[in-house]
Each structure stands twice: as C-alpha cells, then as structure tokens.
Curated annotation (Swiss-Prot):
SUPFAM superfamilies: Cytochrome P450. The lineage of its organism: Eukaryota, Amoebozoa, Evosea, Eumycetozoa, Dictyostelia. It comes from Dictyostelium discoideum. GO terms for molecular function: heme binding; iron ion binding; monooxygenase activity; oxidoreductase activity, acting on paired donors, with incorporation or reduction of molecular oxygen. This is Probable cytochrome P450 514A2. The gene is cyp514A2. It comes from the Eukaryota. Keywords: Heme, Iron, Membrane, Metal-binding, Monooxygenase, Oxidoreductase, Transmembrane, Transmembrane helix. Pfam families: p450. Heme binds at C446. The chain crosses the membrane at residues 4-24. The keyword Nucleotide-binding does not apply. Its EC number is 1.14.-.-.
Amino acid sequence: MNLIYTIILTIIILVLIISIKDLFFEDKIKKINKSIPSPPTIPIFGNLLQINSKDVATCFNDFYKQYGKVYRLRLGSVETVVLTGGDIIDECFNKKYRDFLKARYVKFSRYLGKDTNILHSNGDYHFLLKGVLSSQVTVRKLNNGRLEFNKYILQMFNNLNNNDEGSTMFLANDVPSQIKKLILKVVLNFTLGIEENDDINLSLFQNGSNIFKAAGLFIYSDYLPFLFPLDIKSMAKSNMISSYVFVRDYLAKKLEEVKKKEYIINGDDDGGVDTSQTPLIESYYKLYLQGLIGYDSILLSIVDIIIASVDTTSNSISFIIARLTNHQEIQSKIYEEIMSNDINNNSNNISFSDHSKYPYIISIMNETYRYYASVPLPEPNMTTEDIEVDGYKIAKGTQIYKNIRGTLISKEFWGEDALEFKPERFKTQTLNQKGLLHFGAGPRGCPGARFTECFFFTLMVLLFKNYKLQNPNDNPIDDRGDVGLSMQCKPYDALFIKRN
C-alpha cells in the first residue's frame, strides 16, 4: 500500500513540476513556433486531449480545414507542426529543406527500433539499410522475374477455384484476406527466399496484421509518459507484443539457417548462384559480417519490410477491387484496353515494362493511390535545423507530420470533384505523377514503391483479362475502410466469372 501511495505522490509532483514549467517558462522551440496558427491549448496536455485516438488522420485533417496548410499542435511536451498540400510537402521534403527533414522523429513506443530498423533508424545507418532494399527492387530486376508476380497471381486464381479448370465461376470469400495472403507469399520469397506451407503463412498473416493495426494506435504516453496506464488496455487488446515476438522468433530461426550457408560464411559473393535472386535476408547478413549493421537490424528491418509491404499493398489493391466490383462499366473499359494490347493472347506473361501501353489502367492506379491513400498520416519526421515554410518559422527539433490523406482528398488541391473516384483526372498522366505523395516524399520515401507498382499493374492485367467480377450481394460493397496507420479494407466477397 505504501508503494502505491509513493507512486501516486510521485506522479502528482511530476504533474505539478510540468504545470509550472508549462505556465511560466517558454523554451526555444515553443518561442520560435508560437506564431504558427494553432488550436487553443491547455496546460500540460496541450492539444493532446483534442485528438480522436480512433481516427487521428481525420482529426488532423479537420484541424487543417480550420487552421490552414501549416498549423501547430502541442502534443503534451512535443512541439508538432502538420503540413498539408502537395506543393508545401514537395518543397520541404524534396527541394528546399530536403537535408533538414531526413530524420525520423522516434516516439517512445517506437524506441525499440531506434537506430536499429529500417523504419526508425536515422542518418547513414538508415540509408545503408534502405539502399540494400532499393537495389533489389529495381524495375530491371522486377521485369526479369525477380519476384515471379505472374506465377503467384495465377496460382491464387487456381486455388480460389479449387484448381477446377472446367469451372466458369467461383465465389471468393473475404477478398482482402486472399490478397494479403498472396502478397505475403511474394514478400517471403523476396525477403527470405522461401515458400511456406499454408499453416505458417496463416500464422504470419494473422500476427502481421495484429502488429500493423497496433502500429496505428494513438499512444498518449508517446507525449506524456505518465499517461502510460491509459495505453495499457488498448495495447494489450491488440496482441501487439505477442504477435511481434512470434514474427521475430520465426525470422530468427530463418536467420540461423542463413548462417549455415557455406558460401556466405566463406565470403564468396555469389556462391555459384544468381545474385539477382539473392534473398534480402542474405544481403543484410553480409552487411552484418562486414560489421556495417547490427544483428538485430537484420531481424527488425525484415519485420518492418514484411509487415509494411504486405499491409499497404494489399489494402490498396483490395480497395480498388471492391470499387470495380461495384462498377462493371470500369471493368469493361479495362478489359477493352487489355484486349487491344493482347493480339497474340499473351498477356498472362505481362511485364511492368509494358505499362505505358495501358494508360487507362495507369489512370486507375493513380486514382487509387489518391482516393484510397494507403498511409493517411505517415510516421513523423523531425527538423534538424530551423526552417521557414509558407512564411512561418519552424524550430529545430519540431515533430513534423505530413497530412497525406487530407492533401489527396481536399477540394483546395483537387477541385470540387475531389471526393469522387474519377480515373479520368489522370488520363494523360504517367504513373506516380507529381502531387500524389502516396509513397511519401524526400529521402524517407517508401523504398518499396516499385514493388507495389509492378505488382499492382500485373494483378490488374491478369485479373481483368481472365475474370469479370460481380457483387454476390444486393447492397454495394463498403469501400470506405477503417483508419489506422494504414487504411484497412473491410472484408467482402466477390463472384469471379471466367472470361472466354
């Protein structure tokens, strides 16, 4: 009992100290940032209690509508600025302040990966990890069959159809889960060089989903550590820790198998194998043997890559399949474009190098990236120098959020039809055109962008060349999604009707 009283008294004293500091002292960061538009704050908490923890992205977007493209929040003790708009984000992250916004702001709940994994490391260490990944997902390697997209996609169709070649239609249950399992197979092949059985794939799928959903939780103790008791319930409910341990232990076993490969132990660069097919885990292990990265970096970075790539890519694709299942007329246009390019009936061997021949599919991909922003509010960056944005000074050490979802659905930037799904707006545009920002911006942009683009394009061609999709229910499929770190597509079924 005395211990409980001591803890309570300690918390009260800490709160009083923070309150006095907050009311009577103004640190350098707060002094520089104070001219930036901001909602009213309250002592200690700042704007923390105004944040809707269940939908942070929408909450931040509501602030943008009220306070403008550059506004300030004080989340507990953390000075924060939120940026909205393609031009402003492009200026800050790709041009004027590119070198001052390379650093990731590492929250308390992400501290495990600080200076270790690909997502939360900083400086040269981060760019070393990212560089290895980027070198393995070049367009050339992807076009040369590095990930065998076509094979895995066609296998999924056969599995959904119970390998019955004579069947003309079948019902696919929970399409988003089917897409996630498909991409998981591709990513395991890329990162580990293996194909697992269905039971292990299912366990990885379930635990990976738990981790990514939990990563989207708003953690109050990231900003005021004494609020940790408020976070315990939501963190425990998500099974985040047990799921993370499961995935990490699985990868640790796979890394032990890599360590036994003689050509790696002996320092042989290729071991008599095609280096373009080298699994990512082996490339990272070689860096470890050279003393360039830590052992934990291999495991934690592979966890990041598997979970992030599976979740974001699968949700983007699941959303557009839902949309097209509701809209047969768009499917018809896609099919016409495919067949006009498929004189020799060879599109099952489609390659990303052919994508320029499919402008309508590319316009649909671009509109999907815009309308269904896979990561509405990415992990924050941090200013490493004082900067000036849109006339406002922002201090060194400020947490910076990019309001991606708000940027992509705002009428200010996209016109009165911003809330409509309209592929025609990109009719004359190239893939991943300027202003979309769906893969982030600047040096911390997504290194797996080409992976997503290649897979997305390949699946669109193979799916709509071979099948027409129908909604088996009377009500339209709900494609609104649940908000988290990534937009989560809700489960739905679709009827696959084989084309002649």
